[in-house]
Amino acid sequence: MNLHEYQAKQLFAEFGLPVPEGYACDTPQEAFEAAGRISTAKKVVKCQVHAGGRGKAGGVELHDTKEGVKAFAQKWLGKNLVTYQTDANGQPVSKILVEEASNIANELYLGAVVDRSTRRIVFMASTEGGVEIEKVAEETPELIHKAAIDPLVGPQAYQGRELAFKLGLQGDQIKQFVKIFMGLGEMFAQYDLALLEINPLVITAEGNLLCLDGKINIDSNAMYRQPKLRQMHDASQEDAREAHAAKWELNYVALDGNVGCMVNGAGLAMGTMDIVNLHGGKPANFLDVGGGATKERVAEAFKIILSDTNVKAVLVNIFGGIVRCDMIAEGIIGAVKEVGVSVPVVVRLEGTNAELGRKVLAESGLDIIAAVSLTDAAQKVVAAAEGK
C-alpha cells in the first residue's frame, strides 16, 4: 500500500524529522486559507497522487499569492493527473498539498528498502538528490552509499554518521542527519514498511536539512496489525479491478492486451504471459488465483477479467498440485455458467486428476476449448482472440 506525500510527511513529523509547514486541502477555499497561514512569500502547491513525475506534468507549481494557490486547486481538484508513471487515464486528484517554499542550496537522496539478499533493511544515501535513484544506480553506482541495519540492534548512530561523512555534511548537519536516519530506521520497523524515500532531502540556504518530499510503501501483508495506516488507504488511487481482486485475495494486475489470463501460481502466471506474447498475443492481465482456486474465487476472477472490455479470449492455465484438476474443472464450469462468459475460453489442465478434469470439461456441454500443452493453449487462445 502506498501513501501520499502529505501522509508520509505526517509520519516523518511524528518521528522528529524536519518537514516544511504544509496543509492537505480538499477544496479551493481550503487551499486559499492554507496559503494565508503560511508565512513564506512563496507557496508550493502539489497534486497528491500515487505517481512520480508530477512536476513535469504540471502537478507542482510555485505561487506568490493566495489567489494563485486557489486557482491551482480549482484547476486540479476532481481532475486526473497524467504522468509518465500513470496510464493514459492518469490518477484522480482529491487533495492538494499547500506548503511553504524552501531556499534550496543542495539536494540529497535518502531511502531504505528491505534487501532480500542480505535479509535486512538497507539504507541508501546519495549526493544525487532530486533525480531518479534507479538512474543513478545504473549510471554512477559509486555515488550510492549503503548501510545495512542489524535487526537485533536496529539503526545505530555511527551508521548515520558514516553516511553523513560520505555525503560531505559538516558540523550540525551531521547531527541533523543522524537524527533523521535514526527516526527513519525506527519508523521503518514500527510501521512494517517495504520502502521509503526522501527525494530530495535538501540542505537549505541556512544550512539545515529538510525532508522536501516523501514516498512510503507499506508491506500489504502486515496491514492487519497497522490499523492507523489502514485508515490512510486511498482506494481512488488504485485500479478498480485490482482493488476488487484484493478483496478476494486474488493477485491481479491490469495490462493493455486482449487475452485474459487466469493461472494458479505467480511463476506459472508469468510464464503463461510470456508464451502468449511469444505466439503473437498480448496479455490483458496478470491474475494468480493461488492454491485455493474455489468455484467462488474462479467466478470472481472471470468477472474481473471480463470487466475489461478489451478482453477477446480467456486462457485458464491450472497446474493441479495442491488442488485437484477435476475440482478446478467443476469450478470453471460453475463460474462460466454463473458469469455468462461471452468470449472464447481456452483451458489447459495439468497435474493431479488432469485427465479427469479434462473429461469433466468435455462432458459439460459448454463451449470450452481444451488444450493439451502450454504451447497448444497459447496458440489456441491467440487465434480465438483474433477471431480465427
Swiss-Prot record:
Pathway: Carbohydrate metabolism; tricarboxylic acid cycle; succinate from succinyl-CoA (ligase route): step 1/1. Its cofactor is Mg(2+). It comes from the Bacteria. Mg(2+) binds at N199, D213. InterPro entries: ATP-grasp, ATP-grasp_succ-CoA_synth-type, ATP_grasp_subdomain_1, Succ-CoA_synthase_bsu_CS, SUCC_ACL_C, Succ_CoA_ligase-like_bsu, Succinyl-CoA_synth-like. Its EC number is 6.2.1.5. Keywords: ATP-binding, Ligase, Magnesium, Metal-binding, Nucleotide-binding, Tricarboxylic acid cycle. It holds the Pfam family Ligase_CoA. Binds 1 Mg(2+) ion per subunit. Residues 9-244 form the ATP-grasp domain. ATP binds at K46, G53, R54, G55, E99, S102, E107. GO terms for biological process: succinyl-CoA metabolic process; tricarboxylic acid cycle. One of its GO terms (molecular function) is ATP binding. It catalyses: succinate + ATP + CoA = succinyl-CoA + ADP + phosphate; GTP + succinate + CoA = succinyl-CoA + GDP + phosphate. Disulfide bonds: none annotated. Substrate binds at N264, G321, I322, V323. The keyword Ligase applies. One of its GO terms (cellular component) is cytosol. Succinyl-CoA synthetase functions in the citric acid cycle (TCA), coupling the hydrolysis of succinyl-CoA to the synthesis of either ATP or GTP and thus represents the only step of substrate-level phosphorylation in the TCA. The beta subunit provides nucleotide specificity of the enzyme and binds the substrate succinate, while the binding sites for coenzyme A and phosphate are found in the alpha subunit. Heterotetramer of two alpha and two beta subunits. Belongs to the succinate/malate CoA ligase beta subunit family. This is Succinate--CoA ligase [ADP-forming] subunit beta. It comes from Vibrio cholerae serotype O1 (strain ATCC 39315 / El Tor Inaba N16961). The lineage of its organism: Bacteria, Pseudomonadati, Pseudomonadota, Gammaproteobacteria, Vibrionales. The gene is sucC.
